[in-house]
Each structure stands twice: as C-alpha cells, then as structure tokens.
C-alpha cells in the first residue's frame, strides 16, 4: 500500500484527536481555545484530503475507507467532550443521537457494499450539510469564548441533530427495498 499526501492528511487528522482531547483537560483558561483550534485543523484536513485526492487523482480504496473512519472518531470524541463539559441531557441526547446515527449508517453502508449496492447509500448533500453544522457546533461548544458563541453552538447542535435524523432517514429510504428483502 502506497501512502499519498491525501492519505497522510487523513492519518494526521487521526493523530490530532488525542491532542484536542488532552487540550480539553488542560487546567488553563486558554485550554478551550487550543482544543477548538486543534479541532479546526483536524476538521480542515477532512475537507482538504478529499479535495486533493480528487484534484490529483489520488483516490485510493484505503483512503476511501480511512477518511470516514477518521471523521467519525474525531466527531465522536468531540461530542463526548462537549457532553462531559455541559453534563446535561439536552446536550448528551443530541450527542448520543449523532453517534448512534453514525454507527447505524456505517453499518448500513457496509451491508449495502456486501450486496454490491454501496452507491445507493453514498454520501448525500444532506450528509455534507449535516457535517458542516456539526463541525461548526462542536467548534463553538469546545471553545465557548462568550455566551453568543456558545448559544450559536447550541443552536447549530440542534440543527445538526435534525439533519442527522433527516439524512439517516434518506439513507434508510434509499436502502429500504433491500432492507425489506433481508
């Protein structure tokens, strides 16, 4: 297996996860900002690795596998941290919903791939919009420099939660005939 720059960016994103987790727990007033900045860099590599892979025609099966895995680990870690910080059901419930959706859709994609129908549950524009809202919410809720920023994060978290359900139902609907035959 040959590693190209887009795949190295994905590996770099995975390597950043422990650093934003550690930054979250630092006992300094600037720790939330550092945590959010590391998360921003990791989130930027999510966009940049795919862009470069397509631009340079360096898409690989390994990269196609690793990229969504890196995304899910990064987002799940951030959701757990945000849930721990706020320690309330109205943050934990959307976080648990998003993590559950990622597990369900990843499993659905794997199953559809075994049937040779992975393209029917390929990433949709709704999934991309959900991810954008999710990333923005997590940045705001990890950083939380002021009330307005935090409030925006809460609102985006709930927007992302609604989109989480919407996109999940889109994927399930796309696979429904195969699910009924199973």
Curated annotation (Swiss-Prot):
It is found in: Cell inner membrane. Keywords: Cell inner membrane, Cell membrane, Lipid biosynthesis, Lipid metabolism, Membrane, Phospholipid biosynthesis, Phospholipid metabolism, Transferase, Transmembrane, Transmembrane helix. Residues 38-60, 108-145 are periplasmic. One of its GO terms (cellular component) is plasma membrane. The chain crosses the membrane at residues 13-37, 61-81, 87-107, 146-168. It catalyses: a CDP-1,2-diacyl-sn-glycerol + sn-glycerol 3-phosphate = a 1,2-diacyl-sn-glycero-3-phospho-(1'-sn-glycero-3'-phosphate) + CMP + H(+). It is a multi-pass membrane protein. Pfam families: CDP-OH_P_transf. GO terms for molecular function: CDP-diacylglycerol-glycerol-3-phosphate 3-phosphatidyltransferase activity. Residues 1-12, 82-86, 169-181 are cytoplasmic. GO terms for biological process: phosphatidylglycerol biosynthetic process. Pathway: Phospholipid metabolism; phosphatidylglycerol biosynthesis; phosphatidylglycerol from CDP-diacylglycerol: step 1/2. It comes from the Bacteria. Coiled coil: none annotated. Its EC number is 2.7.8.5. Belongs to the CDP-alcohol phosphatidyltransferase class-I family. Catalyzes the conversion of cytidine diphosphate diacylglycerol (CDP-DG) and glycerol 3-phosphate into phosphatidylglycerol. Essential for the synthesis of anionic phospholipids, thereby playing a role in balancing the ratio of zwitterionic and anionic phospholipids, which is thought to be important for normal membrane function. This is CDP-diacylglycerol--glycerol-3-phosphate 3-phosphatidyltransferase.
């Amino acid at each position: 297996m040959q590693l190209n720059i887009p795949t190295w960016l994905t590996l770099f994103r995975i390597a950043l996860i422990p650093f934003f987790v550690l930054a979250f727990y630092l006992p300094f007033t600037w720790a939330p900002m550092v945590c959010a900045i590391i998360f921003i860099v990791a989130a930027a590599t999510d966009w940049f690795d795919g862009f470069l892979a397509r631009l340079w025609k360096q898409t690989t099966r390994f990269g196609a596998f690793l990229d969504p895995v890196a995304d899910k680990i990064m987002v799940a870690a951030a959701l757990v941290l945000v849930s721990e910080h706020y320690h309330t059901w109205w943050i934990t419930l959307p976080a648990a919903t998003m993590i559950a959706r990622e597990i369900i859709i990843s499993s659905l994609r794997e199953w559809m791939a075994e049937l040779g129908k992975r393209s029917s549950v390929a990433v949709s524009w709704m999934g991309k919009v959900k991810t954008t809202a999710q990333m923005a919410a997590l940045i705001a809720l990890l950083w939380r420099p002021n009330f307005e920023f935090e409030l925006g994060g809460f609102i985006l978290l709930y927007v992302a939660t609604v989109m989480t359900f919407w996109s999940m139902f889109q994927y399930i609907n796309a696979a429904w005939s195969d699910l009924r035959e199973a």
